[in-house]
Regions:
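Sec-exported extracytoplasmic/periplasmic mature domains
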Residues: 35, 80-84, 97, 128-135
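Short Fe-S-cluster ligation motifs
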Residues: 66-79
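Sec-dependent bacterial lipoprotein signal peptides
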Residues: 1-19
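Electrostatic cytochrome c docking/interface patches
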Residues: 14-29, 65-67
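Detector for the c-type heme attachment site
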Residues: 22-23, 37-43, 97, 128
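The canonical Cys-X-X-Cys-His
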Residues: 30-40, 92, 123, 127
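Sequence context surrounding c-type heme c attachment/ligation sites in exported
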Residues: 24-35, 113-118
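Axial heme c-ligation environment in periplasmic c-type cytochrome domains
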Residues: 50, 57, 79-115
């Protein structure tokens, strides 16, 4: 019984460590690839923002602009360049580092699990973690 409890505790700690690592990796990729335009806080006021044709989006209000739900698949499609919306007035930098390496299966909402680059998923998860309401 004691060995079983210890095993479950170790599994729980390993899962917690994986969540922390995912958050750190997503945040690190955000700071390296996105903060220049969107700012360290994601609100659209990065150091390069003034030199751009259009103001970068406030990435902390993605869910608020989507009725409170974070549109994970759409966010990943914007990041990797697959979906280019009318509101985006210029090319985002190449995010090829997010498209390399290991893939994980992501539920895309249509019942299909889609292999997706893990760094892309981690970045989208980080963006989900910084969401706020418009009132904040």
């Amino acid at each position: 019984m004691r060995a079983t409890s210890s095993l479950f505790a170790l599994i729980g700690l390993a899962a917690l460590g994986a969540c922390t690592q995912e958050s750190e990796t997503g945040e690190s990729n955000y700071l390296n690839l996105c903060a220049g335009c969107h700012g360290d806080d994601g609100r659209g006021a990065g150091p390069a923002a003034d030199s751009l044709e259009a103001t970068p989006a406030d990435l902390t209000l993605i869910a608020a602009r989507n009725g409170g739900a974070f549109p994970m698949v759409e966010v990943m499609s914007k990041i990797d360049g697959y979906a280019k919306g009318e509101e985006h007035h210029g090319a985002m930098p190449a995010f090829w580092p997010l498209l390399e390496g290991r893939t994980v299966l992501v539920q895309t909402g249509d019942g299909i699990l889609t292999p997706t680059p893990e760094p892309l998923v981690e970045l989208a998860e980080y963006l989900r973690s910084i969401q706020r309401s418009e009132a904040e």
